[in-house]
């Protein structure tokens, strides 16, 4: 089959020409337009999520050989969460080539974060099936670019990440409260609780309120993202 002009342009933007063009067509086809003869991208999204995770895990291990699992986990989550995938999808104009049903199109489907993130993962899977893991790896590293280099700083700012997570789900900004102080005056220990608008909370203790807030936010964000998965 031959791809349309807009899909050929999309191939150029992501730097991969498909040997089997139908794989790309399936990757950009939403469930709202699927049929017996036109499969949607849900199964590809499932596979692409795993390919993306493997590429990112390898990249993070290579970038910081001394990092612990606890240090790597928030960096990994920052790179693979739906908000990041959607941002990358927008940068390559994925929304412009999505194949949507009328109702999904009328409701702004081309701009929906979850839909864009899922479709990008489907594209990653399509490249993997079309040309193998190395091609998919090159694609991911190229599209994520400086995000991988910046992820350590981004992951440290867990309060911002948690606020973005909450806002993306229509929740108010997280609330932080110092609930305890212990230890001597010269070396106090502050316990801080963070609370989301959905009632979820997490506590953490540290030598300063700022560090305790960041630790509590990081722990709560990791728990919420694990539930999203």
Swiss-Prot record:
InterPro entries: dsRBD_dom (IPR014720), RNase_III (IPR011907), RNase_III_dom (IPR000999), RNase_III_sf (IPR036389). It is found in: Cytoplasm. It comes from the Bacteria. Its EC number is 3.1.26.3. Residues 7-132 form the RNase III domain. It catalyses: Endonucleolytic cleavage to 5'-phosphomonoester. GO terms for cellular component: cytoplasm. Digests double-stranded RNA. Involved in the processing of primary rRNA transcript to yield the immediate precursors to the large and small rRNAs (23S and 16S). Processes some mRNAs, and tRNAs when they are encoded in the rRNA operon. Processes pre-crRNA and tracrRNA of type II CRISPR loci if present in the organism. This is Ribonuclease 3.
